[in-house]
Amino acid sequence: EKYYRPLASGKKYGCFGLTEPNAGSDAAGQQTTAVKEGDHYVLNGSKIFITNSGFSDIFVVFAMTDKSKGTKGISAFIIEKGMPGFTIGNDIPRMGIRAASNCELAFDNVIVPAENLIGREGEGFKIAMATLDGGRIGVAAIALGIAQGAINETIKYVGERKQFGKTIGSFQNTKFKLAELQAKVDAARLL
């Protein structure tokens, strides 16, 4: 309730912190740790390329609570902007998706109340994968749109560019290549 209503109403923004500098997309390679001490956890480590982190208020962060259990030792926590020891780095420049900030997050002995554990200890990997599965369809849709846009621009270009006295779009080989590309995009759209 404390976090859901502000997020659902748009009064606060949230993000999802899984990727780490030394683990990349290998969630099992997490090095961020959360050690339970009484009624709280102490979080140490870092995350990188965390989408929307530059303006978020609430962060779902994944950390190892038991390294001996591999992915079953990963837990999920709610971290609030401004918690002592929690810092948000500068936006990381990248080639695409520039509308969203992507920053590094650093945790230096961040005290996280035990009530900020999402689910139970060891359920973090399952939570992360369920979240990623939902987001992957969006990434696929973006990629499909980019591919279609590239084909549309190519069609314009081959209709204007001349070689040997005629547009290169009039050559049979060019038509075959464009038809093949369009067929692949259409097939992807039907998935």
Where are the regions that the model predicts?
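Cytochrome P450 C-terminal beta-domain/meander region
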Residues: 26-44
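Glycine-rich beta->alpha junctions and the first turn(s) of the following alpha-helix
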Residues: 76, 86-187
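Short Gly/Pro-enriched turn/cap motifs at secondary-structure boundaries
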Residues: 22-25, 49-52, 66-68, 94-101
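N-terminal glycine-rich flavin-associated loop
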Residues: 1, 24-27
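Buried hydrophobic positions in well-ordered alpha/beta secondary-structure cores of metabolic enzymes
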Residues: 16, 34, 43-45, 61, ...
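Internal helix-loop-helix
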Residues: 1-10, 51-58, 70, 137
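FAD-binding glycine-rich core of flavoenzymes that anchor FAD
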Residues: 1-20, 36-39
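A short core secondary-structure module
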Residues: 40, 44-88
